[in-house]
Regions:
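N-terminal entrance/gating region of PLP-dependent enzymes' catalytic architecture
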Residues: 1-67
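Electropositive phosphate-/nucleotide-binding environments in soluble metabolic enzymes
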Residues: 2-6, 59-66, 86-89, 116, ...
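Short loop-beta-helix segment that forms the pyridoxal 5′-phosphate
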Residues: 20, 53-57, 61, 73-93
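Glycine- and acidic
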Residues: 51-55, 77-82, 104-109, 154-156
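Acidic-glycine-rich active-site phosphate/pyrophosphate-binding loop
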Residues: 60-73, 197-202
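Conserved PLP-enzyme active-site core in the AAT-like
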Residues: 90-210
Length: 210
């Protein structure tokens, strides 16, 4: 029966050993204060406060999107923000395509410590367009020749090792060779670190999922 099958599956699953990941790879546990939980996430007024008609959507949702975009511009130090994409990987791919549309070059430089799930999306989107993904260790010496044929560079902050480092050398080379500078940044990290817009990045992407 279905109940017997569920019981057996639960028994099998109970043998799994769940260990804590201290790296995260972009997925970090956070605490949501109860005041935010009650007044924002659990408050139906944000999405039903005006009208259910599709033509006008809802004033609450529009206000929430406006507040979100305003917050992102303040955190990143960049002049504009969109109303979000599907996930971090998709946003990174869209940023790559934005940079590609501004140049006839074919190489795209990627931080070798980028999150693996983001790299997979970049490679999938790059393949049909003939874009070459060039992975570089930004912690070592960076050959200038790599930037000569590149239309953009993407940096992960913090990276897959949990390191948060300024990439002044990378940004200077990108500026010299007119490469679009893209940062994949944790929005919560932007509360404590210098805004990526002030660092010199042209575009910022990240994930608000927790």
């Amino acid at each position: 029966s279905e109940q017997q099958a569920l019981t057996e599956l639960k028994d099998i699953a109970s043998h799994n050993v769940v260990k804590r990941s201290l790296i995260g790879q972009g997925y970090y546990g956070t605490i949501t204060p109860s005041v935010i939980l009650r007044n924002v996430f659990e408050n139906p007024a944000w999405y039903t406060s005006y009208t259910p008609y599709q033509a006008e959507i809802s004033q609450g949702r529009l206000e929430a999107l406006f507040n979100y975009q305003t917050l992102i511009t303040e955190l990143t130090g960049l002049p504009v923000a969109n109303a979000s994409l599907l996930d971090e990987g998709t946003a990174a791919a869209e940023a790559m395509l934005l940079a590609h549309s501004q140049s006839k070059k074919k190489d795209f430089i990627v931080d070798d410590k980028i999150f693996p799930q983001t790299l997979e999306v970049l490679q999938t989107r790059a393949r049909p367009l003939g874009i070459n993904i060039v992975k570089i260790d930004f912690d070592g010496s960076i050959p200038m020749a790599f930037f000569a044929d590149a239309f953009g560079v993407i940096v992960q902050l913090p990276n897959s090792h949990g390191n948060l480092r300024h990439r002044d050398g990378v940004l200077r080379l990108a500026e010299v060779y007119k490469c679009m500078k893209i940062a994949i940044v944790d929005p919560l990290a932007q509360v404590l670190m210098q805004p990526v817009g002030e660092m010199g990045f042209d575009v910022a992407v990240g994930s608000m999922q927790r």
